[in-house]
């Protein structure tokens, strides 16, 4: 499995397994099966509400001698309710307990949004709950304060690399001005309908690795019954993507993944079947040509599906 060298000195697998929306009834078995299939990177989050199940799958594979802990690259994300420096370690400790590990390889700030703290014993994960029913409530915590708390946890050995998710360029630049430990990874929504070339160029120019999520565009959000996704043509059925897939004898999904991986961007698709797991893992077995990239570039319409403006008019991407 190819890997990406992070600025922290660690190697991150270039292809991983995304744990968002994995069926809770089969999650542990899916993680275990993915490890047996050769996956080593598992991208999770506190908000996905399945870290105990991910941990169970990991433990089973380790107990059976299929892998050692050091063979795996486990990613989690700090949820919005835990940004205050007093609460960062509380949330991380819950993640470590759920995953049944002593450290995570990568811990990301999930969104540059700070909700009101909700005690873990009150509701975990809290999702959009801020202690007042369905009403949003916020805390005034600068991102750099959260970051400094994460830096302390790196020094304590509980986290190996730290990074951010869903950050625009301006916030990333501001963070770099005050960070002692640079972000190792920027994880963003990235697909042909939302290509963000300048953001990716900026991050990579600063030695920050990029991970793409939602590589298949609207597909993940159709499952959530989201209006924009339901009204958007699936990338799997896009004539440009289909033509490129036919030219290379690959599936549209493989083309979408290779479009990112060939540019040095890590990918984290999920799959429920072994054949698809193998297909996704095999994306580096072919190369797109210059014309393929030029044709895909024309599909960019700056269409974002994961936008906090939809939650409560939170202006991250306005």
From Swiss-Prot:
Amino-acid positions noted as binding NAD(+) in the UniProt annotation, renumbered to this chain: 165-166, 214-223, 270-280
Any single GO BP term: cellular response to osmotic stress
Known catalytic reactions: xylitol + NAD(+) = D-xylose + NADH + H(+); xylitol + NADP(+) = D-xylose + NADPH + H(+)
pH relationship of activity: Optimum pH is 6.0.
GO molecular function: D-xylose reductase (NADPH) activity; mRNA binding
CDD domains membership: AKR_AKR2B1-10 (cd19113)
Site-annotated residues for Lowers pKa of active site Tyr: 77
InterPro entries reported for this sequence: AKR (IPR020471), AKR2B1 (IPR044486), Aldo/ket_reductase_CS (IPR018170), NADP_OxRdtase_dom (IPR023210), NADP_OxRdtase_dom_sf (IPR036812)
PROSITE patterns in alphabetical order: ALDOKETO_REDUCTASE_1, ALDOKETO_REDUCTASE_2, ALDOKETO_REDUCTASE_3
Pathway: Carbohydrate metabolism; D-xylose degradation
Keyword Signal: no
Family according to the record: Belongs to the aldo/keto reductase family.
PANTHER family cross-referenced by the UniProt entry: ALDO/KETO REDUCTASE (PTHR11732)
Protein name: NAD(P)H-dependent D-xylose reductase
